[in-house]
Amino acid sequence: MIQQETILQVADNSGVKKVMCVKVLGGSKKRYATLGDEIIVAVKEAQPAYGLRDGQGKKVHNKAVQRAVVVRTKKEVRRPDGTYIRFDDNAVAIIDDKGNPKGTRIFGPVARELRDKKYMKIISLAPEVL
């Protein structure tokens, strides 16, 4: 369960290391984000002089605001078959406005729930889908 002010790891090679959730997308009353949900994040830690570029062609720096999709959560998620899935960390992948990942690699496993939410590009880049 991800909510405002939650600090998350970034699971791609976009150059961003840590982000903070600013807003959970999906309606005014939506408080928590889970696997496959889109959130708005603020960059808290980025590799210096490296990483994604914003619309003006400048390097992304701390405090930059980006869109991201949740790929791993510590809180367990119940699947329709009755099993539960949980991970060791809370992680996101940075995406653009069309839902495509900005990085070219995904580190660590991602949840199968991303397939249901139509994030097939992230699924194909991930080394393991659980």
Swiss-Prot record:
Gene3D superfamilies: Ribosomal protein L14. It comes from the Bacteria. GO terms for cellular component: cytosolic large ribosomal subunit. One of its GO terms (molecular function) is structural constituent of ribosome. Keywords: Ribonucleoprotein, Ribosomal protein, RNA-binding, rRNA-binding. The keyword Ribosomal protein applies. Pfam families: Ribosomal_L14 (PF00238). Disulfide bonds: none annotated. GO terms for biological process: translation. The keyword Thylakoid does not apply. SMART domains: Ribosomal_L14. Binds to 23S rRNA. Forms part of two intersubunit bridges in the 70S ribosome. Belongs to the universal ribosomal protein uL14 family. Part of the 50S ribosomal subunit. Forms a cluster with proteins L3 and L19. In the 70S ribosome, L14 and L19 interact and together make contacts with the 16S rRNA in bridges B5 and B8. This is Large ribosomal subunit protein uL14. It comes from Leptospira biflexa serovar Patoc (strain Patoc 1 / ATCC 23582 / Paris). The lineage of its organism: Bacteria, Pseudomonadati, Spirochaetota, Spirochaetia, Leptospirales.
